[in-house]
Amino acid sequence: MIGDEERLLFANDAFYAAFASADIRAMQDLWADKHPVSVIHPGADIVVGRAEVLASWKAILRDDTGFDIEHRNPVARLLGETGIVLCRERVGTHHLIATNVFVRIVDNWRIAHHQSGPAPLQAKPKQEEQRPVH
Amino acid sequence: MIGDEERLLFANDAFYAAFASADIRAMQDLWADKHPVSVIHPGADIVVGRAEVLASWKAILRDDTGFDIEHRNPVARLLGETGIVLCRERVGTHHLIATNVFVRIVDNWRIAHHQSGPAPLQAKPKQEEQRPVH
């Protein structure tokens, strides 16, 4: 039987599949419609509200037949009716790292928040560079 | 009577107060101890697990009597037993933007996840720079 964590990771896969295929309709269906939603795209400001969040996706996906994105090493964190998936993203040559927050709707998970920002390089940084800004 | 959202913003304030005063004991008390916890510090990799998350804070706060951080414009998003606070951070001269996920423990909120990454400059970018990486 498929478990909560598997379903959560499946929803996360579906989010990146919609992204990669620039499928705005699938993206709409994946975002929660009965919970507050928000997004922080890389280097961009906070976007709050379903209409505003979907408009941000339309702007990103508007003239693409597809999007060169893949995600790696997803980690699922279950917090009851909410679930978080943390993963790495590669968008073209950019390496990013993301927090995706999902809410459970019966047996499905729908996304309520996404933040993505720069990831460290795969190579180990030097000792004096290991300490992050915070 | 104080509401859920006010309590959630209060917990977010407490998180930044612990950070600013480099109070590792307060930080320990603020992080959830019965839920999975994780953190993504700016430009750093995913850290999972309470011991690992607290060790990351100890490394950041270890030789500081205080930390030059302030947060601004917090926005609370209630998802039932989970709450998200989105806010801007200023750390020294760095401008960051954060997702803080909290879990409700009776009447309190404890932090379960934090991601912080670069914020856009306050000035409006030029037209061709407005589109984020994604």
Feature map (PLM): residue ranges:
Chain A
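Helix-to-beta-strand junctions that scaffold the AdoMet/dcAdoMet cofactor pocket
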Residues: 32
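A beta-strand edge to alpha-helix "cap/lid" segment located at domain peripheries
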Residues: 2-29, 37-134
